[in-house]
Amino acid sequence: MISKPDKNKLRLKRHRRIRGKISGTAERPRLSIFRSNKNIYAQLIDDVAGVTLASASTLDENVSDATKLEQAAAVGKAIAEAAKAKNISTVVFDRSGYLYHGRIQALADAARENGLDF
């Protein structure tokens, strides 16, 4: 029998490796992303204090009739606006082991267009 690698286990392995190298502070928090089949979530995290500074997700937004890519872009815009409200302009991007493609890229591009630097 041919064994297929478990994609989520490989993603979690990449995520642990990435998290060993990056960390967020109050001045430059970590923009962490989680993607499920149905929704996408983004958080600004201060790892020094262990606090979530702001968050946004497709559950917050009224984007039920939009495509998943459009939903991700709306979340990117919302997290950038939440960061502006807290006077945060630069972040450390944590893609959580996901490939920088599709919904992850759409969220990142929308956040950049709305004023976040990373």
Curated annotation (Swiss-Prot):
Keywords: Ribonucleoprotein, Ribosomal protein, RNA-binding, rRNA-binding. Gene3D superfamilies: 3.30.420.100. Part of the 50S ribosomal subunit; part of the 5S rRNA/L5/L18/L25 subcomplex. Contacts the 5S and 23S rRNAs. Pfam families: Ribosomal_L18p. This is one of the proteins that bind and probably mediate the attachment of the 5S RNA into the large ribosomal subunit, where it forms part of the central protuberance. It comes from Lactobacillus acidophilus (strain ATCC 700396 / NCK56 / N2 / NCFM). The gene is rplR. Coiled coil: none annotated. PANTHER family: 39S RIBOSOMAL PROTEIN L18, MITOCHONDRIAL (PTHR12899), LARGE RIBOSOMAL SUBUNIT PROTEIN UL18M (PTHR12899:SF3). GO terms for biological process: translation. This is Large ribosomal subunit protein uL18. Belongs to the universal ribosomal protein uL18 family. InterPro entries: Ribosomal_uL18_bac-type (IPR004389), Ribosomal_uL18_bac/euk (IPR005484).
